[in-house]
């Protein structure tokens, strides 16, 4: 049995590309209780907490947990609370390069645990006020770290990426695939 510690439709869609049969169960953790560390350490601690929270309920299962955040100039950009916060985020990212970090935590059915942080650099085009307003009118910023999804209207903001495209969507499937298949270390 394979468990994805998420109800994210994007993560489910991506995981189906490498694991056709799995169950999705959200992790119940208090993210605010975890100390905010540097971005890579923080996403790894969130992924670890999510995965570990499901171990008691699924002791013999392979559990996959992930957490993705956007960071700009060392500051974490989570999911915007409202349109105004989304506007601030998108405006700040215009013409700049930021990082997308995903912490992966995998507990195999044999009990071994693997962890990794994947980083992707994303550069936005310079954005006018009209560009930002046009993007926000699509409501595509909702429920997205950094207020954009590269798989939808957010793609029009992106000038280039350096790294794993699927990491920006929330699940770096190439890395995850290798974590699932690798020999125990």
UniProtKB/Swiss-Prot annotation:
This is dTTP/UTP pyrophosphatase. One of its GO terms (molecular function) is dTTP diphosphatase activity. The lineage of its organism: Bacteria, Bacillati, Bacillota, Bacilli, Lactobacillales. Its cofactor is a divalent metal cation. It is an enzyme of class 3 (hydrolase). It catalyses: dTTP + H2O = dTMP + diphosphate + H(+); UTP + H2O = UMP + diphosphate + H(+). Nucleoside triphosphate pyrophosphatase that hydrolyzes dTTP and UTP. May have a dual role in cell division arrest and in preventing the incorporation of modified nucleotides into cellular nucleic acids. The keyword Transmembrane helix does not apply. HAMAP family: Maf. Keywords: Cytoplasm, Hydrolase, Nucleotide metabolism. SUPFAM superfamilies: ITPase-like (SSF52972). The keyword Cytoplasm applies. It comes from Lacticaseibacillus casei (strain BL23). The record marks 10, 68, 151 as: Important for substrate specificity. The active site is at residue 67. It is found in: Cytoplasm. GO terms for cellular component: cytoplasm. InterPro entries: ITPase-like_fam, Maf-like. Belongs to the Maf family. YhdE subfamily. GO terms for biological process: nucleotide metabolic process. Its EC number is 3.6.1.9. Pfam families: Maf. Coiled coil: none annotated.
């Amino acid at each position: 049995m394979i468990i994805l510690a998420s109800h994210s439709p994007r993560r489910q869609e991506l995981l189906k590309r490498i694991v056709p049969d799995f169950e999705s169960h959200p992790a119940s953790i208090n993210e605010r209780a975890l100390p905010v560390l540097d971005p890579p350490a923080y996403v790894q601690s969130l992924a670890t907490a999510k995965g570990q929270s499901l171990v008691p309920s699924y002791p013999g299962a392979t559990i996959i947990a992930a957490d993705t955040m956007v960071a700009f100039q060392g500051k974490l950009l989570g999911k915007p609370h409202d349109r105004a916060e989304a506007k601030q985020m998108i405006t700040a990212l215009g013409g700049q390069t930021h990082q997308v970090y995903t912490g992966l935590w995998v507990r195999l059915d044999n009990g071994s645990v693997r962890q990794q942080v994947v980083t992707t650099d994303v550069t936005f085009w310079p954005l006018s006020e009209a560009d930002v307003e046009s993007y926000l009118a699509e409501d595509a910023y909702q429920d997205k770290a950094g207020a954009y999804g590269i798989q939808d209207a957010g793609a029009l903001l992106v000038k280039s990426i350096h790294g794993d495209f699927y990491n920006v969507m929330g699940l770096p499937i190439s890395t995850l695939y290798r974590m699932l298949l690798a020999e125990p270390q």
